[in-house]
Structures are given as structure tokens and as C-alpha cells.
């Protein structure tokens, strides 16, 4: 199993991208590490609010993936330089000031990958 240092994973999150949208909240990820795959979203936590895979969508290269559809059998190719928008629906989670972001995703080579970041939100 490949181990990816946390400081590298943190670079995937695009600082300043966290924003409230009509259906919930969105943020942007950019693969700055190298070609790879996302084989699942276990959960996304913003502040104290947890979004399960059913509440998560990932949009990249014009394709929309529901969090429950992404798996080891049905992974998302996430190439170097590729950008994706992660949308979490159904819950209000943003606060004024700094918001804490924790994403637990799966990668076929590295297993569970944790992305931890902080950001202030933009209005919709």
C-alpha cells in the first residue's frame, strides 16, 4: 500500500473554493499529485456536520458521480491537473469565519485517504 503524506494530500484542496450553494455546500479539488483514481467517498465532514456518500456528488470532466456509485469496481479517474467539484447536499454546515473540512476518500493504491483543510466560505 502506498502512503501519501498529509501535506501533499492537503494541496489537492483548492483554497478559497468553499461556498454555500442553494442545495448545500461545494468545494473544489485539483489533482496536483499525479494520475490516480478515487474508489469511494466514505464521508465528508464540514465543521461538525457529516455528509454520507448518499449526500455527496463529484463533478469532473463534465461527468457527475453520486457518492454511492463510486467504488473499487466503478472508480473515478482523476488525472494530474484535473479539477473536480465536490457537492454536499441537504445540510447547513458553514459558519462565519474558519470552517474545518475533513474528507475521507478511498484510493485503490493508498486505501483510506484523509484530506484535512480549513477555509472561509464564500456566499452563493
Where are the regions a protein language model picked out?
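Terminal leader/tail segments of proteins
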Residues: 1-46, 50-124
Amino acid at each position: 500500500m502506498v502512503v501519501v503524506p498529509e501535506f501533499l494530500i492537503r494541496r489537492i484542496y483548492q483554497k478559497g473554493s468553499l461556498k454555500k450553494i442553494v442545495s448545500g455546500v461545494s468545494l473544489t479539488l485539483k489533482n496536483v499529485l499525479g494520475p490516480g483514481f478515487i474508489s469511494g467517498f466514505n464521508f465528508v465532514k464540514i465543521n461538525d456536520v457529516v455528509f454520507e456518500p448518499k449526500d455527496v456528488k463529484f463533478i469532473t470532466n463534465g461527468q457527475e458521480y453520486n457518492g454511492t456509485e463510486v467504488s473499487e469496481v466503478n472508480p473515478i479517474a482523476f488525472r494530474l491537473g484535473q479539477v473536480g467539484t465536490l457537492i454536499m447536499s441537504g445540510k447547513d454546515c458553514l459558519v462565519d469565519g474558519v470552517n474545518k473540512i475533513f474528507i475521507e476518500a478511498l484510493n485503490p493504491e493508498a486505501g483510506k485517504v484523509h484530506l484535512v483543510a480549513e477555509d472561509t466560505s464564500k456566499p452563493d
